[in-house]
């Protein structure tokens, strides 16, 4: 079992309060899905969009995640693009993923066959 530092955050009342205070229902939906991604797995922006019923809005998901720190601490590092590419300019993302056991096929791309949350 991989140690997940985010799992304790999900169990606290303070955490639930932060989520319930979101003014944007869409952001709430997106971040609720993101917090379900287990350590050692990744999901794509498109997969998250599809799960919330907005299949064509992967860029919207990316936009919400770029401001997720406004809502609390979420494991946004577990979200990559449809090719498994990590976010350009976010150097820490790879380190966070590797610490959870996520494997990479090259410098910037997660091994999606091995690490995809939704298959």
Model feature map: region roles:
Residues 2-119:
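Nucleic acid-binding interface residues in structured DNA/RNA-binding domains
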